[in-house]
From Swiss-Prot:
Keyword field: Nucleotide-binding
Protein name: Nucleotide-binding protein Shew_2893
GO cellular component term, pick one: cytosol
HAMAP family: YajQ (MF_00632)
Statement: the UniProt record of this protein carries the keyword Nucleotide-binding: yes
Organism: Shewanella loihica (strain ATCC BAA-1088 / PV-4)
Gene3D superfamilies in alphabetical order: 3.30.70.860, YajQ-like, domain 2
Family annotation (NCBIfam families): PRK05412.1
Any matching Pfam family: DUF520
MF annotations from Gene Ontology: nucleotide binding
Length: 161
């Protein structure tokens, strides 16, 4: 029986490349000349710091743009609500969602079961295993997962016939 896993992962190499490209763009942009701004990456967390809150928001847009160029879904970004002000700099933390938490997994399994396809979906830690009799059913599940608006991008791996 064909099976596959639904996961939510961020390619760390592409994420680091996007952060480096954002840093390069920051150095070359005219509106950031003479402004102390910094982009740093550590443990799936990007820290954007600049002299004003508005510039931090511009840096978030620059990072989103670079992520989409590197084929990393910007929907996996979790931007802090407010920039932290300390001294003369504002810092904004951006974390990236890894794995499917249990609430989202339950909603996705419910969507799959409500579709009346002949597949079984089982939650396995931070991924969902889907098995079915036909490959077409699994492809329909892939379409359902892509169309679902659960605030998280999904990838599909371990596709077995």
């Amino acid at each position: 029986m064909p099976s596959m896993d639904i996961v939510s992962e961020v390619n760390e190499v592409e994420l680091r490349n996007a952060v480096d490209n954002t840093r390069r763009e920051l150095d070359s942009r005219f509106d950031f000349r003479g402004v102390e701004s910094e982009v740093s990456y550590k443990d799936h967390q990007v820290t954007l710091s600049s002299e004003s809150d508005f510039q931090c928001q511009q840096m978030v847009d620059m990072l989103r743009n670079q992520l989409s160029k590197r084929n990393v879904d910007p929907a996996s970004m979790d931007v802090a609500e407010k920039a932290i002000h300390s001294g003369k700099t504002f810092s904004l933390k951006v974390t990236f969602k890894e794995g499917i938490d249990s609430l989202v997994a339950k909603k996705l399994v419910k969507l799959i079961k409500d579709s009346k396809l002949k597949v079984q979906a089982a939650i396995q830690g931070d991924s969902i295993r889907v098995t079915g009799k036909k490959r077409d059913d699994l492809q329909a599940v892939m379409a359902i997962a892509r169309e679902s608006d659960l605030g998280q991008p999904f990838q599909f791996n371990n596709f077995r016939d």
